[in-house]
Amino acid sequence: MSFTVVIPARYQSTRLPGKPLADIAGKPMVQWVYEQAIQAGAQDVIIATDDQRVADAVAVFGGKVCMTSPNHESGTERLAEVVQLMGIADDHIVVNVQGDEPLIPPSIIRQVAENLAASSAPMATLGVAITSEEEVFNPNAVKVVTDKEGYALYFSRATIPWDRDAFARGEVLTEHSLMRHIGIYAYRAGFINTYVNWQPSSLEKIECLEQLRVLWYGEKIHVELAKEAPPAGVDTPEDLELVRELIAAKS
């Protein structure tokens, strides 16, 4: 099985300007993500950016860049442009890895690609069991419910499924673990253009979850439990400092 990883790397960030180039142990953040994707066994790793400063930094460490429009409204639109510009075949598997996850385990990058290859869905993703009471009711921890074959029934910021009896007894964490969605996706390349040409659905607008568009239009997303739980990504200066400390502790 071969697959390509695309890493969106926008320079502009409200909470952390210049995020892709933030220094972590002497390397820009985007290089850490790139190296994790290489370790996952990707046939090709492409960094998608709309900023020449990012492109120049990637050239220094020998990565491949695809310059994209600065006017995309979503990461999926940027991904569709990469597929078109790079001439990626419709049946090829493309994994979208966020550019702010320098510690993402290579194992789950490969796992989501293998998950898609083994299913009939046009799209696949991963989840982890929720083990924290705080996450059960946290709207920032997106929940996913699947059918018996692992296909997503729904994604929500709400607590789903609602364990009526256990919650009534004050039991938040039960044997029926809720699943938290991890924001890593694999696509069949030809499906990406279909996806971005659909009109946004009312459900995705309500939940602010773009993946609900796929379910709204009757397509499937396959979900597996991740082999490893990835560390949190970098959204703030505090997150960046934590990652620096974690990497320093390992070296």
From Swiss-Prot:
Primary enzyme class: transferase
A GO cellular component entry from the record: cytosol
Metal-binding as UniProt keyword: no
Compartments in which it is found: Cytoplasm
Gene3D superfamilies assigned: Spore Coat Polysaccharide Biosynthesis Protein SpsA, Chain A
Enzyme nomenclature, EC number: 2.7.7.38
Record field: catalytic activity: 3-deoxy-alpha-D-manno-oct-2-ulosonate + CTP = CMP-3-deoxy-beta-D-manno-octulosonate + diphosphate
UniProt-recorded Gene Ontology molecular function terms: 3-deoxy-manno-octulosonate cytidylyltransferase activity
Main location: cytoplasm
GO BP term, pick one: lipopolysaccharide biosynthetic process
UniProt record similarity statement: Belongs to the KdsB family.
Its job: Activates KDO (a required 8-carbon sugar) for incorporation into bacterial lipopolysaccharide in Gram-negative bacteria.
Protein name: 3-deoxy-manno-octulosonate cytidylyltransferase
The organism of origin for this protein: Vibrio vulnificus (strain CMCP6)
Organism lineage: Bacteria, Pseudomonadati, Pseudomonadota, Gammaproteobacteria, Vibrionales
